[in-house]
Amino acid sequence: MNAVGIDVSKGKSMIAVMRPFGEVVASPFEISHTERELKELTRFLKSLSGETKVIMEYTGKYYQPIARYLREAGIFVSVVNAILVHDYGGTSLRRVKTDKKDAIKIANYGLDRWIDLAEYTPEEDIRHLL
């Protein structure tokens, strides 16, 4: 079971891969939203043993290219409301926010809600179903 937390921003993302009990599969690393780097990320995610789910927050439109790319590559992607992730895990007195910590928090959120994660469906796909 691999939870991939992706903290998305404009043109780049911070990635963290976690397993249950706080096991770090991959220390947080950054990728650009280029074809080459998304292809490398896809190859890496497919090489992981066990089931893998990618979790990211709705971030305006910035999440869409990476979510679509990974979904089209056959990887499970779940896009969640940022407020749910923000409220997850209690509050910290320090309130330190970094992309690395956010990616880890998103991955841990995914682990705790593994069974309930809804798979991402692009808007066009939803329109075709109507």
Question: Residue spans of the language-model regions?
Answer:
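Phosphate- and other anionic-substrate recognition elements at nucleic-acid/protein interfaces
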Residues: M1-L130
